[in-house]
Amino acid sequence: VAEPLIQPLDAYHSPKVDMLRLDRFDALAPGNKWFKLRENIAVARKQGARCLVSLGGAYSNHLHALAAWGHHNRWPTAAFIRADEAQVTPCMADLRRWGMRLVHLSRSDYRRRHDPEYIASLLRGFDRPYFIPEGGANALGASGCADIAALLPDCGADYSLIVTACGTGATLAGLASAVAGSTRILGIPVLKAEAFMARDIAQILDDLGSPRKNWHLDHRFAGKGFGRVSDELSEFILRFEAQQRVPLDPVYTAKLCFAVDAMHKRGELAGESRVLVIHSGGLQGRSGHPALFNQSVLGISGQCSGTTKQRSNF
């Protein structure tokens, strides 16, 4: 039985809080990843590309989704990955199993990922590649994320505030470009991004032709930085999953829900009529923290038996 995408979080009242369960949306590229990939893949098809190429870290949700989709659709994929040659993570094992070609980059080389000339030099060894930026974070990825709003009644008009985690900001930009006019978007950065994220989101919105000002960022919840899980966050994850029976990933949705929980308890959401939290998927990341998620009532997989995910058509 396919479960509904919108689920109330019963612990929260005044205001009520719902969750959009994008982790239930697509088995190959769950969460926001399908939305970021779809328009990029459409352009790659039009260009006659023979290989989809991207980059990311050793636990990348984006690369995991891209490799799974490529394997299923028999389209070669490759990735420049920030990892040592000897490093093996559960995510990387999946990438290799699905046939993704991995090219290892040092941390210093990976820092050049925004340099067009450097990327062009990396792509020279590929046959008709189509390059997708880190996390699918380009205007096409954000444009795809605009379709998330279409999953909500009246494009989210029932909600005064929609809250989403931010890594690159592309999901927030897409949502901000498409939600109902009265709805505001709050982004929770999961990395220390005060110096650049707001600028990057504004640029993406300009690229989309939608320079809306209906969004803002709250940088208080980045914690120790990207992918870092503190003892306090670990305790919250276990408590939240036991109470709500909603699986969280350790990088994005854990910090997102921690932030919403903290703001609700402090009364910072008291002026809102209704709040929606975006579950952006990423549950494959649980496998990188077995000691933590083996303690969860949901286990490492975070999956409940007897349910199926809704499928996309790409």
Regions found by a protein language model. Name each.
Residues 1-304, 309-314:
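PLP-dependent amino-acid enzyme catalytic core
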